């Protein structure tokens, strides 16, 4: 059933038109009886929107009876969205089952026998991150691919390679991977 935010399903209550609605319902469909309107006057409505208010009253009225009386023909509020949704769902599933059983023999034969395909396994390797990279510790000078040099290289590189003037040097730039020393 199609519903807008405020329509509360009243206009198009059932997809099956005349069959599900009793003749009394069909007769009195649009109009509200005088008795209702007289009763309504001194009450303060719960919803400002009168369509929703009607619907609420109707469902309340229906809930009073619900326990005792179960009739074959559905009462007006019974065929409101809840009931019809259940009914429609049941019907849909039944028809789906029927069609499946019809087509299953054909399909079963042509498909290749079912192989067991496990989902791909995810393999974790744990790689050690040297501590000076991880929490930029004052690092060992490392030369990649070789053992670290047994003693420091013969003469240390000159501290400033710049010809004219050094760019502004504050705290050395700190990222996890490239830090020779921590940022302070």
From Swiss-Prot:
GO terms for biological process: cell differentiation; epithelium regeneration; female sex determination; female sex differentiation; mRNA splicing, via spliceosome; regulation of stem cell division. The keyword Nucleus applies. GO terms for molecular function: pre-mRNA binding. This is Female-specific protein transformer. RS domain directs localization of proteins to the speckled subnuclear compartment and the purpose of this localization is to allow colocalization and co-concentration of components of the splicing and splicing regulatory machinery to permit relatively high rates and/or efficiencies of reaction and interaction. Residues 1-39, 49-58 have a biased composition (Basic and acidic residues). The sexual regulation of tra occurs through a mechanism of sex-specific alternative RNA splicing. The non-sex-specific RNA expressed in males is not translated. Its main location: nucleus.
């Amino acid at each position: 059933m199609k519903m807008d935010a405020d329509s509360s399903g009243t206009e198009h209550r059932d997809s099956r038109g005349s069959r599900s609605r009793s003749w009394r319902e069909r007769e009195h469909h649009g109009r509200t009886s005088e008795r209702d309107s007289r009763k309504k006057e001194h009450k303060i409505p719960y919803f400002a929107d009168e369509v929703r208010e009607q619907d609420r009253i109707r469902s309340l009225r229906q809930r009073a009876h619900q326990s005792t009386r179960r009739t074959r023909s559905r009462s007006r509020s019974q065929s409101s969205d809840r009931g019809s949704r259940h009914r429609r769902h049941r019907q849909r599933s039944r028809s789906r089952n029927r069609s499946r059983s019809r087509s299953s023999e054909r399909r079963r034969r042509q498909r290749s026998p079912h192989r067991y395909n496990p989902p791909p396994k995810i393999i974790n390797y744990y790689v050690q991150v040297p501590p000076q990279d991880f929490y930029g510790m004052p690092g060992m000078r490392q030369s990649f691919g070789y053992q670290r040099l047994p003693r420091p290289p013969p003469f240390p590189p000159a501290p400033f390679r710049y010809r004219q003037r050094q760019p502004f040097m504050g705290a050395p730039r700190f990222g996890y991977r490239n830090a020779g020393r921590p940022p302070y």
